[in-house]
């Protein structure tokens, strides 16, 4: 097969995985990498929409039907645990030696967790709770004896901008009892290869493309806090290292913001789509550097019917305004780096000025809200039927999420409720 124009390199020089593959059709890239991995028992996990598409047929034909041992189609948003276990059982029965995913963050997260559970012979949610208690954010890295590393190779082919394909984190929701979303981190959950094909994403509905784009914006924006740097970032954590991280976050955020607008103007612009996809490779660096209540509150909105990316559209501007109003000088200086990205770019500046904003009287929440509005995305909980009566339960769940607990402005249940009222 011709590999002219194929690009293949590490996503990030600081980690051995994943590698990025792009420049040729995804099905050709997957077949090439499957052969290089000497895989003969390939398992495909596809989103519900892609499971009915020509794209899946193209992938199967390229791989050779004889090498495909199973399929799992349609993991719901926010990744229900029952679907993770359904996938886990299938992986065991088929003895897959390679997994290929087609879809967004829920599919990617489901495979991450199933791979890790498979390596540790987990069969029940109770066993998973015990194992995964060692893999929660902020905890020391567990030994390989405590948590066996995931071992089945995986190729992710993303069709949204969630950025999950580049991270070692995953989340799943208990839909049978408390409806809480649990976040897990383990080094072995990195993908082996991420295949990027902007043409494949043309079939992704605009709502999902732009909302997951804002989710990626959320990763970069909260990553600027630096509140997780001492526990999560690999490096010397010196002041100079932190400055480099901040510059990288600003550069990737700016590239993503501008390219998203190009897609808004021209849906078929595959060059802009590829720029967005490539910008996401720095999401792990941002997420390991900082996180906050937009993620923590957002994790708890899934069971109420809010899509993964749409949680950021609604909550991120409100959390930013709260943190700006209640933060100290150091935090304000960090948040100013976000507004600098907007006011330092001619395209983004025009967007803000056209909406009546000016540098001297805007905060980070204002500029992010204006940008989300320009993309035509939802901006209130009421649009999802979430009202005051549910705020206290959401806030209670959010306060058990580590992302809320480490927000740079200390929060409690009542303060989270205040943020929810801002998003009402």
Curated annotation (Swiss-Prot):
The keyword Oxidoreductase applies. Disruption phenotype: Impairs the production of fumonisins but accumaulates the intermediate tetradehydro-fumonisin B1. Pfam families: ADH_Fe_C, Fe-ADH. One of its GO terms (biological process) is fumonisin biosynthetic process. Induction: Expression correlates with fuminisins production. Its EC number is 1.14.11.-. Keywords: Iron, NAD, Oxidoreductase. It comes from the Eukaryota. GO terms for molecular function: alcohol dehydrogenase (NAD+) activity; metal ion binding. Dehydrogenase; part of the gene cluster that mediates the biosynthesis of fumonisins B1 (FB1), B2 (FB2), B3 (FB3), and B4 (FB4), which are carcinogenic mycotoxins. Within the pathway, FUM7 is involved the addition of the tricarballylic moieties to the carbon backbone. Belongs to the iron-containing alcohol dehydrogenase family. This is Dehydrogenase FUM7. The gene is FUM7.
């Amino acid at each position: 097969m011709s590999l002219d124009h194929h690009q293949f390199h590490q996503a990030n020089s600081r980690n051995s995985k994943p590698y990025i593959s792009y420049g040729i059709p995804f099905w050709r890239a997957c077949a090439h990498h499957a052969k290089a991995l000497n895989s003969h028992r390939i398992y495909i996990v596809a989103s519900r929409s892609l499971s009915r598409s020509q794209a899946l047929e193209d992938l199967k034909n390229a791989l050779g039907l004889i090498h495909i041992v199973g399929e799992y189609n349609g993991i719901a948003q926010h990744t229900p645990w029952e679907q993770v276990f359904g996938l886990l059982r299938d992986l065991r029965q088929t003895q897959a030696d390679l997994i290929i995913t087609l879809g967004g963050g829920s599919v990617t997260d489901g495979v991450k967790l199933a791979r890790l559970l498979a390596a540790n012979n987990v069969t029940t949610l109770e066993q998973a709770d015990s194992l995964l208690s060692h893999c929660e954010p902020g905890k020391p890295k567990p030994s390989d004896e405590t948590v066996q590393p995931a071992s089945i190779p995986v190729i992710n082919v993303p069709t949204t901008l969630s950025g999950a394909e580049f991270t070692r984190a995953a989340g799943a929701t208990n839909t049978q009892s408390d409806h809480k979303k649990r976040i897990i981190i383990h080094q072995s959950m990195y993908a082996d290869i991420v295949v990027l094909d902007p043409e494949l994403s043309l079939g992704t509905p605009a709502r999902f493309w732009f909302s997951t784009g804002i989710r990626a914006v959320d990763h970069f924006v909260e990553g600027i806090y630096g509140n997780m740097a001492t526990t999560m970032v690999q490096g010397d954590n010196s002041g100079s290292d932190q400055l480099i991280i901040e510059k990288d976050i600003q550069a990737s955020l700016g590239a993503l913001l501008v390219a998203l607008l190009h897609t808004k103007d021209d849906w078929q612009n595959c060059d802009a789509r590829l720029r967005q996809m490539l910008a996401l490779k720095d999401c792990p660096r941002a997420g390991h550097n900082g996180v906050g209540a937009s993620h923590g509150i957002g994790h708890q909105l899934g069971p109420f019917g809010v899509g993964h990316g749409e949680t950021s559209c609604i909550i991120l501007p409100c959390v930013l305004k709260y943190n700006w109003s209640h933060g100290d000088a150091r935090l304000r200086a960090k948040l100013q780096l976000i507004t600098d990205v907007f006011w330092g770019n001619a395209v983004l500046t025009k967007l803000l000025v056209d909406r009546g904003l000016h540098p001297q009287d805007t905060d980070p929440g204002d500029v992010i809200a204006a940008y989300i509005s320009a993309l035509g995305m939802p901006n209130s909980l009421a649009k999802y039927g979430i009202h005051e009566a549910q705020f206290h339960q959401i806030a209670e769940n959010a306060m058990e999420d580590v992302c809320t607990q480490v927000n740079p402005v200390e929060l409690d249940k009542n303060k989270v409720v205040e943020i929810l009222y801002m998003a009402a």
